[in-house]
Amino acid sequence: MRIGYTLMGEQRSPRQLVDDAVLAEQSGFAFLVASDHLSPWLEVQGHSPYTWSVLGAVAQATTSIPFMTFVTCPILRYHPAVVAQKAATVQLLSDGRFSLGLGAGENLNEHVVGKGWPPVDVRHEMLAEAVEIIRALWGGSFVTHRGRHFQVESAKLYDVPDVLPPIGIAASGSQSTSLAAGQGDYLIATEPKREIVESYRSAGGTGEVVGQLPVCYGEKDKALQVLHEQFRWSGLGWKVNSELPGTAAFDSASAYVRPEDLSEVAAWGTDPQPYAEKLQAFAEAGFDAVALVQVGPEQAPFCAWYAEHLRPALQPEGRP
């Protein structure tokens, strides 16, 4: 199983994210994933730069490490035609190292354009139509599309890479795993649940499965404190996380998440063993790759510890 690194824009400035990407490549991570938010989850996180500008810089600052969005929502804040153009551009800038992770989004980021927040089944319809538009535009011809949710009028992309970015689709249930199997090239999921992977495979999905694990390297008690302060929202679950409209709502909703509750979703401290155990759960569920999220500001110490301690503790090539 490949181990990656998360460029989490909700907690880092644009320049820091580019520096983090370089450091992650030097530290031996197999790939990068980048969140795509307008807002942080919690006010204390304090950042949320425009991911696509950061990715252009990452493409130039790194040399060989693959990277993806984790994930971009192409249904409200971004029109799918614009997503098609910027994904094609980043693929060209990175010499073919980019892949496009897509999902049905969160109200947190999408409500800002004032178009409301559709029910999840409608968002999945919109996502399916958006993928259709993106792939059509990557064909390099003029595209006119008059669909149920989107209109495209005589659009053409003039800079399209020879090798198109693979499209991953985030899923947590049967409707979205079917969408990922039918229209995506790989599956994205954040929980090590075998039933998600099996649903994807049963629907005909043959691509790899990519997950994500929150971690916090550091002295154990302090690391748990940082994890709880900045990442307690992860204990709410995605059915809640997709619906809340802003940082104040997440602050309130997560007020009763206790530090010990995070043991279900995260690893922390300086001992590689808890990290390896959490990664093993993903491997046993059928995941092919997992990106670690180092919560908090200590990115350089974490990368050094990964290279010196965690990576060697795993099987060769960063595989648990």
Identify what each model region corresponds to.
Residues 1-320:
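Active-site-adjacent structural elements that line small-molecule/cofactor binding pockets in enzymes
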